């Protein structure tokens, strides 16, 4: 697949600290006609999410510092399958702005993409550092397993320090992107326009009739509905449906379905909080933690842990068929 390499073609390195220039380069790369729905935006949001969602508040390990997905132990986690694409998309930006760390670039790309796709402008602070080797990576098993229910969702998100309202707000990221059987075992998109940030995800959760569907290639169960207006099939994951069957989660689903502005405000705050997990700052906002210790809390093993990591030819592909990053990788 050809990658639209616009920032590199524009030639000139920016001044260190010019994050507006970095954002401009990210926006230039969002249009990817040969990739999912013509946009790199959703996978950049997922990269920011997964690079931050390893945090454990008890041990103060994991989080957005380090850019651990450059190494096989984290990048090769089946939960991160397909994110090689996001890293490949951003490599021209890194070459054009070599002064920015990968951990800052990945998180900045997420908030930039959300805003460019019609979402809220999310507060973001720089200063993250990159690991120099793979000795300080968080353990696998900390990211959500979409095949599970409400108990698992709380297990994962409470560990990071989120409450029920924040959990549902962050789930609204499923307004963007789609699932690929080759990556997660699930297939399809949640909403009609997966490159436009909105509250349609919540409205569809409540308005549609969701029926069970098994994906033949993976044997995983998801939920399906055919949109009456467009006649296209949409899907929901077990974790999505759990938001409607749990009484506490459900009240926030109903709130966000009715009021997009409230959802945007709550998502803005929750996503900013997510990107700061594991980051210690002084009164001036400067990052003062030097690393994240390896070890700490492990969540229950996920079903996807038995799935081999995706492999394929170098470069980004529609189905996430890039090789995983090995322990000396620089992407």
From Swiss-Prot:
<dbReference type="InterPro" id="IPR019794">
    <property type="entry name" value="Peroxidases_AS"/>
</dbReference>
<dbReference type="GO" id="GO:0020037">
    <property type="term" value="F:heme binding"/>
</dbReference>
<feature type="site" description="Transition state stabilizer">
    <location>
        <position position="46"/>
    </location>
</feature>
<dbReference type="InterPro" id="IPR044831">
    <property type="entry name" value="Ccp1-like"/>
</dbReference>
<keyword id="KW-0575">Peroxidase</keyword>
<feature type="binding site" description="axial binding residue">
    <location>
        <position position="174"/>
    </location>
    <ligand>
        <name>heme b</name>
    </ligand>
</feature>
<feature type="region of interest" description="Disordered">
    <location>
        <begin position="288"/>
        <end position="331"/>
    </location>
</feature>
<keyword id="KW-0349">Heme</keyword>
<dbReference type="GO" id="GO:0034599">
    <property type="term" value="P:cellular response to oxidative stress"/>
</dbReference>
<keyword id="KW-0408">Iron</keyword>
<feature type="active site" description="Tryptophan radical intermediate">
    <location>
        <position position="190"/>
    </location>
</feature>
<dbReference type="InterPro" id="IPR002016">
    <property type="entry name" value="Haem_peroxidase"/>
</dbReference>
<keyword id="KW-0479">Metal-binding</keyword>
<feature type="active site" description="Proton acceptor">
    <location>
        <position position="50"/>
    </location>
</feature>
<dbReference type="GO" id="GO:0046872">
    <property type="term" value="F:metal ion binding"/>
</dbReference>
<dbReference type="InterPro" id="IPR010255">
    <property type="entry name" value="Haem_peroxidase_sf"/>
</dbReference>
<protein>
    <recommendedName>
        <fullName>Putative heme-binding peroxidase</fullName>
        <ecNumber>1.11.1.-</ecNumber>
    </recommendedName>
</protein>
<dbReference type="GO" id="GO:0042744">
    <property type="term" value="P:hydrogen peroxide catabolic process"/>
</dbReference>
<feature type="compositionally biased region" description="Polar residues">
    <location>
        <begin position="306"/>
        <end position="316"/>
    </location>
</feature>
<dbReference type="InterPro" id="IPR019793">
    <property type="entry name" value="Peroxidases_heam-ligand_BS"/>
</dbReference>
<keyword id="KW-0560">Oxidoreductase</keyword>
<comment type="similarity">
    <text>Belongs to the peroxidase family. Cytochrome c peroxidase subfamily.</text>
</comment>
<dbReference type="GO" id="GO:0000302">
    <property type="term" value="P:response to reactive oxygen species"/>
</dbReference>
<dbReference type="GO" id="GO:0004601">
    <property type="term" value="F:peroxidase activity"/>
</dbReference>
<dbReference type="InterPro" id="IPR002207">
    <property type="entry name" value="Peroxidase_I"/>
</dbReference>
<dbReference type="Pfam" id="PF00141">
    <property type="entry name" value="peroxidase"/>
</dbReference>
<comment type="function">
    <text>Destroys radicals which are normally produced within the cells and which are toxic to biological systems.</text>
</comment>
């Amino acid at each position: 697949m050809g990658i639209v390499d616009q920032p590199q073609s524009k030639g000139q390195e920016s001044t260190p600290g010019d994050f507006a220039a970095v954002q401009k380069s990210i926006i230039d790369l969002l249009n990817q006609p040969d990739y999912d729905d013509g946009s790199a935006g959703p996978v950049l949001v997922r990269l920011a999410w997964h690079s931050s969602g390893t945090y454990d508040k008890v041990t103060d390990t994991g989080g957005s510092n380090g850019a651990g997905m450059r190494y096989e132990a984290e990048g090769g986690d089946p939960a991160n399958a397909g994110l090689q694409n996001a890293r490949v998309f951003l490599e021209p930006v890194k070459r054009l702005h070599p002064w920015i760390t990968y951990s800052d670039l990945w998180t900045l790309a997420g908030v930039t993409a959300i805003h460019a796709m019609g979402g809220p402008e999310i507060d973001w602070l720089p200063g993250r550092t990159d690991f120099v080797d793979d000795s300080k990576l968080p353990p696998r098993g900390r990211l959500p397993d979409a095949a599970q229910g409400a108990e698992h969702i709380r297990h994962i998100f409470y560990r990071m320090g989120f409450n029920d309202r924040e959990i549902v707000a962050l789930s609204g990221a499923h307004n963007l992107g789609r699932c690929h059987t080759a990556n997660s075992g699930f297939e399809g998109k949640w909403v009609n326009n997966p490159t436009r940030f909105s509250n349609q995800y919540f409205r569809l959760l409540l308005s549609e009739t969701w029926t069970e569907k098994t994906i033949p290639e993976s044997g995983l169960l998801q939920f399906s509905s055919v949109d009456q207006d467009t006649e296209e099939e949409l899907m929901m994951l077990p974790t999505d449906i759990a938001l409607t069957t749990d009484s506490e989660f459900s009240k926030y689903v109903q709130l966000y379905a009715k009021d997009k502005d409230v959802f945007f405000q709550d998502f803005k705050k929750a996503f900013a909080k997510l990107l700061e997990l594991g980051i210690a700052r002084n009164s001036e906002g400067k990052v003062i933690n030097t690393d994240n210790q390896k070890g700490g809390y492990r969540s229950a093993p996920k079903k996807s842990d038995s799935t081999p990591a995706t492999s394929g030819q170098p470069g980004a592909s529609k189905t996430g068929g890039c090789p995983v990053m090995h322990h000396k990788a620089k992407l």
